[in-house]
Amino acid sequence: MEINGVTIQMLPAASGDCIYLEFPDSDFRMLIDGGYAKTYQKYLKKFLLKLAAEGKRLNLIVVTHIDDDHISGIRALLKENGDSRNPKIIEIDEIWFNSLNQCITSRNAEQGMSFAVKIILKSMCSTDIDFECEYKKQNISYTNGKNLAELIQAGGYRWNASVVDNLVSKGQIVQFGDLKITILNPGIETLTKMGKKWLYHLKQINSNNIEIT
């Protein structure tokens, strides 16, 4: 499908999303979410290999949710793609993804994250914790976000590099050449609420005395 010169392709992702946008005039390509892992294996991998064979790259990947039907396909891609400097599938310039650690950082930006919270975050690296997202009314797993963050770091990908404070948030306008992207969501309020809820669950499952205000 093409709208105003922009190519839009929605790959099969069942209940999730996997959306490809190409802006020919700006020579810019963006992937929004990756659906399930099977979305990657059945559809996305072949699609990206074709792009790479044409000499194209992904300028930006945007991960909007940490639910399986949005994030798992991206995890599968990064796991197979490997090192960003020598990718096995396709070159990726940058990834936008707010990890839970960044949500906590947004809440503590002014007061600073306490040493106790930092220690607990490190200690929880191998633990699965589910909590109810106030806005989505469904359980989402910290493990999804943690694993993606690890893959981004291990592959040396540019992570939220073009946004202020490395946090994708409402109101920012990001320029890629002559292409301008205005970020509509999430707002800082949403991010800080998620961070506060995460800290609450850390407090419930740890013996450490953490005061949450």
Question: Which functions belong to the PLM regions below?
Answer:
Residues 1-6, 81-213:
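Flexible, acidic/histidine-containing loops and adjacent segments that form or flank the divalent-metal
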Residues 42-95:
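Active-site metal-binding motif and surrounding structural segment of the metallo-beta-lactamase
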Residues 34-35, 64-66, 100, 186:
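Active-site-proximal beta-strand/loop segments in catalytic clefts of secreted hydrolases
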Residues 20-21, 70-76, 106-109:
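A short acidic (Asp/Glu
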Residues 22, 29-32, 59-63, 94-98, ...:
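Structural recognition of the beta-strand scaffold that forms the well-ordered cores
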Residues 15-17, 37-38, 66-72, 102-104:
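Active-site environment of divalent metal-dependent phosphoester hydrolases
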Residues 2-57:
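Conserved beta-strand hairpin/beta-sheet module of binuclear metal-dependent hydrolase folds
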